[in-house]
A protein has these predicted regions:
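Hydrophobic transmembrane signal anchors and adjacent membrane-proximal interface regions, especially
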Residues: 4-5, 9, 24, 31-33, ...
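Mixed-charge, glycine-accented linear interaction segment located at domain edges/termini
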Residues: 126-194
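Structured, beta-strand-rich domain cores
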Residues: 65-128
Length: 194
């Protein structure tokens, strides 16, 4: 006879299925992404001057990051990255933010999971000189809540792409501040003034 141990919040405090928030920025606003090839981590991102990450926070159980390995022609591996979220009771501010999001055919997204890890979604690094980003809005629906018997006011959105690998681990986008960093010839980043 098998013994099945239930998985609950006590035994699994760092579950990563759900998302707490995402930060998004259009691809054309990203100047450079600094990637550590050994650690498979994004260590810094430089945006155009005056551009900031746009944050969307989620209620528990309303947003998810899914990563599915795909194999093409029997040997080439890809990963389908999908961010799915629902927003209930749309305020004018949230509606405007989502309309701006839908206006972008390409974006970079940092996703914070429920365990506090950050994932840089939507990029593929072919070699040191080539980086592709192709995350875009996919399926989306909205309900007005006009008929309380059949629907509620909510917006559902999916961001999707196919990349060469799983989303890279990164750091809190609040800490990304290229105005304080400089890149000398030896390729090391230092704080300006030091």
């Amino acid at each position: 006879m098998s013994v099945i141990t239930p998985i609950n919040t006590v035994l699994c405090p760092s579950a990563r299925a759900g998302l707490a928030a995402i930060w998004a920025v259009p691809c054309n606003e990203v100047i450079e992404i600094i990637i550590d090839p050994l650690l498979h981590m994004v260590s810094n991102v430089i945006l155009n001057v005056g551009v900031e990450w746009q944050r969307i926070e989620f209620e528990p159980g309303t947003a998810y990051l899914m990563q599915e390995k795909l194999i093409a022609k029997g040997y080439t591996e890809y990963v389908k990255q999908t961010i799915y979220f629902e927003e209930y009771g749309l305020s004018p501010t949230m509606r405007n933010a989502l309309e701006d999001l839908n206006g972008n055919c390409c974006m970079n997204v940092i996703a914070e999971d429920e365990a506090g890890n950050y994932h840089y979604c939507g990029i593929s690094v072919r070699d040191e000189s080539e980086l592709n980003d192709n995350l875009r809005t996919a399926d989306g629906t909205s309900e007005t809540g006009a008929d309380p018997q059949t629907d509620v006011a909510k917006y559902t959105e999916t961001l999707a792409c196919v990349c060469d690998f799983y989303a890279l681990i990164t750091i809190d986008p609040i800490d990304f501040n290229p105005l304080f960093w400089t890149k000398p010839d030896d390729e090391f980043w230092t704080i300006k003034g030091n």
